[in-house]
A protein has these predicted regions:
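Low-complexity, Gly/Ser/Thr/Pro-rich intrinsically disordered linker/tail segments
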Residues: 129-157
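A general marker of short, structured functional hotspots
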Residues: 3-5, 65, 83, 125, ...
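Residues at the C-termini of beta-strands that transition into short coil/loop
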Residues: 117, 139, 167
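N-terminal capping segments
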Residues: 1-46, 50-59, 114, 148-174
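...with weaker cross-activation on analogous glycine-rich loops/strands in unrelated enzymes
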Residues: 50, 54-129
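Short, low-complexity, polar/charged sequence segments that are solvent-exposed and flexible
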Residues: 26-29, 107, 131-136
């Protein structure tokens, strides 16, 4: 979905490709400067993480950052695995502002995250605020279990491959 799905405040979707992505829709969710405007439909940050886990492994990790955070447990940076989540706190500490999915390490050893970012849509990067993230692992996902699936004839055998596949694959994502 990287580069294919725009950010849309309040954007959620059922598993699989959604033909409504990129079509003009009214933003009805409260709490954003875009509320009441027409924008290309897509996913917000928590809608994206929910979509990835529902599509990739058939697991519901919770709705919204406020639902996903308590459905996860803290992990250290040394324990971080692809598929773990990073939460960015609200500036006043009242809750969680953003959620990202850890995708692995970049060429220079930097941690890479896939997420739906306001103004950019679904992206893969190492954001400037990365050191401020609360690192978490979804409680109801078995990170050691093989993941069923197929990508170009090769079985998908790890959550790392599956998360990468469903986040960036053009074959099954439009």
């Amino acid at each position: 979905l990287v580069g294919k799905v725009p950010y849309f405040w309040g954007g959620k979707s059922a598993p699989g490709w959604n033909d409504e992505w990129n079509t003009p829709r009214l933003v009805t969710a409260a709490g954003s400067s875009t509320t009441g405007t027409i924008r290309p439909y897509g996913l917000d940050c928590s809608g994206f993480s929910t979509w990835v886990f529902n599509t990739a492994v058939g697991v519901d990790i919770g709705a919204g950052t406020s639902g996903q955070y308590p459905n996860s447990v803290a992990v250290s940076a040394s324990e971080l695995l692809p598929g773990d989540l990073g939460f960015l706190a609200e500036s006043d500490g009242s809750g969680w502002n953003h959620v990202l999915i850890f995708a692995g390490y970049g060429e220079n050893g930097e941690r890479m995250w896939v997420h739906s970012s306001g103004g950019q849509g679904v992206i893969l990067n190492s954001p400037s605020y990365e050191a401020s993230l609360s690192l978490r692992r979804p409680k109801n996902v078995d990170f050691n279990a093989p993941v069923p699936g197929d990508t170009l004839g090769t079985p998908i055998s790890t959550l790392e491959v599956d998360v990468t596949h469903y986040c960036a694959c053009a074959k099954c994502c439009g």
